[in-house]
Protein backbone atom coordinates (compact mmCIF):
# COMPACT_ATOMS: atom_id res chain seq x y z
CA UNK A 1 0.00 0.00 0.00
CA UNK A 2 2.82 2.37 0.92
CA UNK A 3 4.64 1.47 -2.30
CA UNK A 4 1.48 2.15 -4.32
CA UNK A 5 1.13 5.58 -2.73
CA UNK A 6 4.79 6.34 -3.41
CA UNK A 7 4.38 5.30 -7.03
CA UNK A 8 1.28 7.50 -7.39
CA UNK A 9 3.14 10.43 -5.85
CA UNK A 10 6.13 9.95 -8.16
CA UNK A 11 3.79 9.84 -11.15
CA UNK A 12 2.11 13.08 -10.10
CA UNK A 13 5.48 14.79 -9.62
CA UNK A 14 5.98 14.93 -13.39
CA UNK A 15 2.45 16.09 -14.19
CA UNK A 16 1.84 19.67 -15.36
CA UNK A 17 0.29 22.25 -13.06
CA UNK A 18 -2.86 22.18 -15.16
CA UNK A 19 -3.20 18.39 -14.91
CA UNK A 20 -2.61 18.50 -11.17
CA UNK A 21 -5.27 21.18 -10.71
CA UNK A 22 -7.75 19.00 -12.59
CA UNK A 23 -6.87 16.13 -10.25
CA UNK A 24 -7.30 18.38 -7.22
CA UNK A 25 -10.77 19.38 -8.38
CA UNK A 26 -11.56 15.67 -8.76
CA UNK A 27 -10.68 15.14 -5.11
CA UNK A 28 -7.11 13.82 -5.42
CA UNK A 29 -5.36 14.78 -2.17
CA UNK A 30 -1.97 13.56 -3.39
CA UNK A 31 -2.17 16.00 -6.31
CA UNK A 32 -2.88 18.77 -3.80
CA UNK A 33 0.19 17.75 -1.79
CA UNK A 34 2.38 17.78 -4.90
CA UNK A 35 1.22 21.27 -5.91
CA UNK A 36 1.61 22.53 -2.35
CA UNK A 37 5.21 21.31 -2.29
CA UNK A 38 5.89 22.73 -5.76
CA UNK A 39 4.62 26.20 -4.82
CA UNK A 40 5.62 26.44 -1.17
CA UNK A 41 8.55 28.65 -2.11
CA UNK A 42 6.18 31.05 -3.91
CA UNK A 43 4.06 31.27 -0.76
CA UNK A 44 7.16 32.14 1.28
CA UNK A 45 8.20 34.72 -1.29
CA UNK A 46 4.78 36.44 -1.19
CA UNK A 47 4.60 36.46 2.61
CA UNK A 48 8.11 37.54 3.50
CA UNK A 49 7.87 41.29 2.85
CA UNK A 50 5.20 41.37 5.57
CA UNK A 51 7.28 39.18 7.85
CA UNK A 52 10.19 41.60 7.46
CA UNK A 53 7.83 44.41 8.42
CA UNK A 54 7.03 42.69 11.71
CA UNK A 55 4.59 39.89 10.99
CA UNK A 56 4.47 36.37 12.36
CA UNK A 57 6.08 33.98 9.89
CA UNK A 58 3.90 30.94 10.62
CA UNK A 59 0.63 32.91 10.53
CA UNK A 60 1.55 34.51 7.21
CA UNK A 61 2.64 31.20 5.66
CA UNK A 62 -0.59 29.54 6.76
CA UNK A 63 -2.69 32.29 5.21
CA UNK A 64 -0.61 32.14 2.04
CA UNK A 65 -1.18 28.38 1.82
CA UNK A 66 -4.93 28.97 2.08
CA UNK A 67 -4.60 31.24 -0.95
CA UNK A 68 -2.63 28.57 -2.81
CA UNK A 69 -5.22 25.89 -2.07
CA UNK A 70 -7.96 28.21 -3.33
CA UNK A 71 -5.96 28.66 -6.55
CA UNK A 72 -5.63 24.89 -7.02
CA UNK A 73 -9.38 24.39 -6.68
CA UNK A 74 -10.48 27.30 -8.86
CA UNK A 75 -7.89 27.47 -11.65
CA UNK A 76 -9.27 27.20 -15.18
CA UNK A 77 -6.59 26.94 -17.91
CA UNK A 78 -8.84 28.36 -20.61
CA UNK A 79 -8.85 31.84 -19.05
CA UNK A 80 -5.39 32.77 -20.30
CA UNK A 81 -3.29 33.14 -17.16
CA UNK A 82 -0.75 30.48 -16.21
CA UNK A 83 -1.30 28.64 -12.94
CA UNK A 84 1.78 30.37 -11.50
CA UNK A 85 0.29 33.80 -12.18
CA UNK A 86 -3.14 32.78 -10.89
CA UNK A 87 -1.63 31.21 -7.76
CA UNK A 88 0.45 34.30 -7.03
CA UNK A 89 -2.65 36.46 -7.39
CA UNK A 90 -4.67 34.26 -5.02
CA UNK A 91 -1.87 34.09 -2.46
CA UNK A 92 -1.32 37.85 -2.42
CA UNK A 93 -5.05 38.54 -2.39
CA UNK A 94 -5.44 36.25 0.63
CA UNK A 95 -2.58 37.98 2.44
CA UNK A 96 -3.98 41.40 1.57
CA UNK A 97 -7.42 40.38 2.82
CA UNK A 98 -6.26 39.12 6.22
CA UNK A 99 -3.84 42.00 6.71
CA UNK A 100 -6.57 44.50 5.88
CA UNK A 101 -8.81 42.77 8.43
CA UNK A 102 -5.97 42.99 10.95
CA UNK A 103 -5.96 46.78 10.70
CA UNK A 104 -9.50 46.80 12.07
CA UNK A 105 -8.71 44.30 14.82
CA UNK A 106 -10.62 41.43 13.22
CA UNK A 107 -7.59 39.16 13.02
CA UNK A 108 -5.67 39.67 16.25
CA UNK A 109 -2.79 37.21 15.62
CA UNK A 110 -1.88 39.17 12.49
CA UNK A 111 -2.31 42.67 13.90
CA UNK A 112 1.43 43.12 14.26
CA UNK A 113 1.98 41.84 10.73
CA UNK A 114 0.59 44.92 9.01
CA UNK A 115 3.40 47.00 7.50
CA UNK A 116 3.46 50.34 9.26
CA UNK A 117 4.06 52.35 6.11
CA UNK A 118 0.82 52.69 4.07
CA UNK A 119 2.60 52.63 0.70
CA UNK A 120 4.27 49.32 1.62
CA UNK A 121 0.86 47.88 2.46
CA UNK A 122 -0.77 49.36 -0.65
CA UNK A 123 1.84 47.71 -2.88
CA UNK A 124 -0.49 44.69 -2.83
CA UNK A 125 -3.73 46.65 -3.25
CA UNK A 126 -4.64 45.55 -6.77
CA UNK A 127 -4.25 41.90 -5.82
CA UNK A 128 -7.52 42.34 -3.93
CA UNK A 129 -9.11 42.66 -7.37
CA UNK A 130 -7.37 39.50 -8.66
CA UNK A 131 -6.24 41.23 -11.85
CA UNK A 132 -3.15 39.41 -13.21
CA UNK A 133 -2.33 42.38 -15.45
CA UNK A 134 -1.54 44.41 -12.34
CA UNK A 135 1.11 41.97 -11.13
CA UNK A 136 3.96 43.77 -12.88
CA UNK A 137 2.91 47.19 -11.58
CA UNK A 138 2.78 45.91 -8.01
CA UNK A 139 6.11 44.15 -8.37
CA UNK A 140 7.69 47.39 -9.56
CA UNK A 141 6.25 49.36 -6.64
CA UNK A 142 7.34 46.75 -4.12
CA UNK A 143 10.78 46.63 -5.75
CA UNK A 144 11.12 50.40 -5.31
CA UNK A 145 10.22 50.16 -1.64
CA UNK A 146 12.67 47.33 -1.08
CA UNK A 147 15.40 49.21 -2.94
CA UNK A 148 15.07 52.00 -0.39
CA UNK A 149 15.22 49.41 2.38
CA UNK A 150 18.47 48.02 0.96
CA UNK A 151 20.17 51.38 1.55
CA UNK A 152 19.97 50.64 5.27
CA UNK A 153 21.74 47.30 5.05
CA UNK A 154 25.29 45.99 4.92
CA UNK A 155 26.55 44.26 1.77
CA UNK A 156 26.05 40.86 3.44
CA UNK A 157 22.53 41.76 4.57
CA UNK A 158 21.60 42.92 1.06
CA UNK A 159 22.72 39.56 -0.31
CA UNK A 160 20.74 37.69 2.34
CA UNK A 161 17.65 39.84 1.72
CA UNK A 162 17.71 39.03 -1.99
CA UNK A 163 17.74 35.29 -1.42
CA UNK A 164 15.23 35.58 1.42
CA UNK A 165 12.68 37.42 -0.69
CA UNK A 166 13.07 34.76 -3.38
CA UNK A 167 11.63 32.31 -0.86
CA UNK A 168 14.74 30.33 0.03
CA UNK A 169 14.91 28.81 3.50
CA UNK A 170 17.62 29.95 5.90
CA UNK A 171 19.39 26.62 5.38
CA UNK A 172 19.30 27.01 1.60
CA UNK A 173 20.65 30.55 1.88
CA UNK A 174 23.39 29.37 4.23
CA UNK A 175 24.50 26.74 1.72
CA UNK A 176 24.46 29.32 -1.09
CA UNK A 177 26.54 31.97 0.70
CA UNK A 178 28.77 29.59 2.65
CA UNK A 179 27.64 30.68 6.10
CA UNK A 180 25.94 28.87 8.98
CA UNK A 181 22.12 28.85 9.22
CA UNK A 182 22.49 30.70 12.53
CA UNK A 183 24.47 33.47 10.81
CA UNK A 184 21.78 33.80 8.15
CA UNK A 185 18.98 33.83 10.73
CA UNK A 186 20.78 36.54 12.70
CA UNK A 187 21.10 38.60 9.51
CA UNK A 188 17.36 38.23 8.83
CA UNK A 189 16.56 39.45 12.33
CA UNK A 190 18.86 42.48 11.87
CA UNK A 191 17.14 43.25 8.57
CA UNK A 192 13.73 43.09 10.26
CA UNK A 193 14.84 45.48 13.00
CA UNK A 194 16.29 47.98 10.53
CA UNK A 195 13.22 47.91 8.30
CA UNK A 196 10.90 48.22 11.31
CA UNK A 197 12.78 51.30 12.54
CA UNK A 198 12.54 52.94 9.14
CA UNK A 199 8.85 52.09 8.78
CA UNK A 200 8.23 53.71 12.15
CA UNK A 201 10.17 56.80 11.10
CA UNK A 202 8.27 57.01 7.80
CA UNK A 203 11.47 57.30 5.77
CA UNK A 204 11.50 53.99 3.93
CA UNK A 205 9.26 55.00 1.03
CA UNK A 206 10.69 58.43 0.50
CA UNK A 207 14.00 57.32 -0.99
Task: Describe the residue ranges of each PLM region.
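Extreme N-terminal regulatory/targeting segments of RNA polymerase sigma factors
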Residues: 1-59, 151, 169, 199-207
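Short, leucine-enriched amphipathic alpha-helices that occur as contiguous helical runs
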Residues: 17, 40, 92, 142, ...
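Short, small-hydrophobic-rich alpha-helical interface motif
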Residues: 24, 39, 43, 60-71, ...
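DNA-binding alpha-helical recognition surfaces that contact promoter or target DNA
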Residues: 45, 85, 89, 162, ...
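Short, aromatic/basic-enriched loop-to-helix "N-cap" motif that marks the start
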Residues: 52-59, 73-90
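Arg/Lys-rich amphipathic alpha helix in sigma70-family domain 2
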Residues: 74, 92-111
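Amphipathic alpha-helical segment used for protein-protein interaction
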Residues: 124-159, 166
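DNA-recognition helix of helix-turn-helix
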Residues: 157, 170-201
Amino acid sequence: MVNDTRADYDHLMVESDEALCASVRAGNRLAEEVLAARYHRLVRSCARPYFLAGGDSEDLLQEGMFGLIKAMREYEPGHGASFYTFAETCIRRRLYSVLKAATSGKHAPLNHAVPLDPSFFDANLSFANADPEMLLIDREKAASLLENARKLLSEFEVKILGYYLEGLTCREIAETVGKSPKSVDNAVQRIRRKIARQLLSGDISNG
